[in-house]
Amino acid sequence: MKVRIRGIYATALTKLFLDNGFEIVQATPQISDRFSLPIRAEPSDVTIKDGNDKGELISIGEDIYSFLRKTFQNSFIWKSPVRLYSVIETNNCKFMDYQVEPCLDKGLVVKPPSEGRIILSSPKAVGKYSMVWRGDGKTFFSEHIRDREEKTRLLSISIPFNKKGYNVKWRSNAPFASNIVLKEELEKLAIRFDNNDFRQQGEDFIKVTVSLEDKIMLDEIRKKVLPNTIRFHHMLKMSFSNEVDEIEQTSMNNEELLDKLITDYMGIEHIKPDGRKFELKEGKVIYKEVNSDYYIVRLMRVFSREGIYDGLNVKKEEGDYDIVEFDSRKWYQIHRYYNKDGKLKGIYVNISTPPELLRGKLRYLDLEVDVVKVGDEVRIIDLEELEKNKEIIGETMYKKIFTIIEEVKKIL
């Protein structure tokens, strides 16, 4: 299988994919140099790249779910139940419990399901290099096709189809195919469109929300190629760019960069298995410890609004505060809630992946289940949410969660 790789994880992923028998195509000059690879200007079967959030990896194309699940055992992995560029038939503006936008009876999936919605466009016949549909007889280009000569070449192939009333959009793989191959695909797609035959089209879309543990795993893989790779390289790359490269070329000391990420007040980003992100109330840093292998950040969060503490079922009052510690070596955070006079009201332990340090905030993947203690009573809550998200969480983390729960119960 031929793989195109882009983004901040490119070196580690290239090593990983090569070691597992994949072929690398369209490598960047830097990657080509690091691995002594020829730059193969060939179409890819699958593209791996950063998501909009550099903490995510996106795979589009052939199905490599099993390989990703085996590799990223401590991360969330979600495979879209609807293939990208497939054509679906809807019912009352819905498909598989997702709302479709716009409300078409039949449409092309142009974005995978997100926040309960699937984004559609009018049906199109989609191939490896192009899309074809009836319209005004125009040619469009992927944003990744920028070379003027290449556009001229592709236009010369699509114009005869434009004259017959077909719109053509050239996809990013098109520059790597010959004129004959491209023309043959357009002919097949035109026939498929006219026959309303969209059965075999579509690409698998997989999202990996990469945990700190798996970023460190990628650090170690990168280190085999570039021995100066520092611990937390990929995590630091989310907040810094050139600074990480400079440190690796000089001092090899990551502590300075880690310390820069810790500000007087730190936000908390709580990521759910379904991809939703929640920004929890920020806290004042009351203790920090940073060295090359780990970091600890302790926060104090003061509450001004009344309410009820989730899970604890204890009243929240003005002046209450929470003391919580984030340790990059631990799979949980213990929240201790006090009233304004310093009396303990309850303890809430959030089970999660070890926390990452980003600029001015901490981030972790929430593993759904939590442990709470009020008085002498210790309870495990939200086990049903864990079961519901077991596939995204994966078997390795699922089993680990129960070990962590027992560890937490002993502490409490």
Curated annotation (Swiss-Prot):
Keyword set, alphabetical order: Endonuclease, Hydrolase, Nuclease, RNA-binding, rRNA processing
A Pfam family per the record: DUF402
Catalytic EC class: hydrolase
Entry coiled-coil feature ranges: none
UniProt GO MF annotations: mRNA 3'-UTR AU-rich region binding; RNA endonuclease activity, producing 5'-phosphomonoesters
Enzyme Commission designation: 3.1.26.-
One GO term (biological process): rRNA processing
HAMAP family, per the entry: RNA_binding_AU_1 (MF_01910)
Function: Probable RNase involved in rRNA stability through maturation and/or degradation of precursor rRNAs. Binds to RNA in loop regions with AU-rich sequences.
Alphabetical list of PANTHER family matching this protein: PTHR39159, UPF0374 PROTEIN YGAC
Family note: Belongs to the FAU-1 family.
Protein name, per record: Probable ribonuclease FAU-1
